[in-house]
Amino acid sequence: MMSQPPKVLLLYAHPESQDSVANRVLLQPVQQLEHVTVHDLYAHYPDFFIDIHYEQQLLREHQIIVFQHPLYTYSCPALLKEWLDRVLARGFANGVGGHALTGKYWRSVITTGEPEGAYRAGGYNRYPMEDILRPFELTAAMCHMHWMNPMIIYWARRQKPEVLASHAQAYAQWLQSPLATGGH
């Protein structure tokens, strides 16, 4: 008898989701997975008024938290930043008594507008992606979470459909057994 995969909360944050072919392709096979809750933050909070208690309850109910978003100005879109600042509050996720996320897993799934070569010393963006994502890794550590290797889709809007489909298949496959196939 196969054991159930851990529950995954996929926090999707893209302010122009309708224009992101890459993210639509990535999300399509994921929608079929019963143990994955896809939570579109921009659809849920168009006014940016985040229901902190609801979000914290979602976090409590899931073992793996996936943050899927485009890379915006070397960070995440504004609503996700607001979400991180408000939901991962002291006393809940960090600080005195803040252990609600201890032992859970964090994985960033990110699309970029530039090719991989732009993210290196001497490249257009001057730093490797690992350095650019360091604030997310530090946030995971602050929340006592395990940091998993991020999935990066470079130059997302310029990828051929078959390349995006391959990324989507790998993503869905990882989500089927997220703790068994590397990623951390």
From Swiss-Prot:
A Pfam short name: Flavodoxin_2
EC number of the protein: 1.6.5.2
Membrane topology, from the record: Peripheral membrane protein
GO molecular function (one): FMN binding
Secretion signal, residue range per the UniProt entry: none
UniProt keyword annotations, A-Z: Cell inner membrane, Cell membrane, Membrane, NAD, Oxidoreductase
GO BP terms: positive regulation of potassium ion transmembrane transport; potassium ion transport
GO cellular component: plasma membrane
Location in or out of the cell: Cell inner membrane
Domain of life: Bacteria
Primary location class: membrane
Keyword Thylakoid: no
Main EC class the enzyme belongs to: oxidoreductase
InterPro entries in the record: Flavodoxin_fold (IPR003680), Flavoprotein-like_sf (IPR029039), K_H_efflux_KefG (IPR023947), KefG/KefF (IPR046980)
Reactions that this protein is recorded to catalyse: a quinone + NADH + H(+) = a quinol + NAD(+); a quinone + NADPH + H(+) = a quinol + NADP(+)
Primary role: Regulatory subunit of a potassium efflux system that confers protection against electrophiles. Required for full activity of KefB.
Subunit structure: Interacts with KefB.
Annotated NCBIfam families: PRK04930.1 (NF003430)
Family: Belongs to the NAD(P)H dehydrogenase (quinone) family. KefG subfamily.
Name used for this protein in its record: Glutathione-regulated potassium-efflux system ancillary protein KefG
Organism this protein belongs to: Yersinia enterocolitica serotype O:8 / biotype 1B (strain NCTC 13174 / 8081)
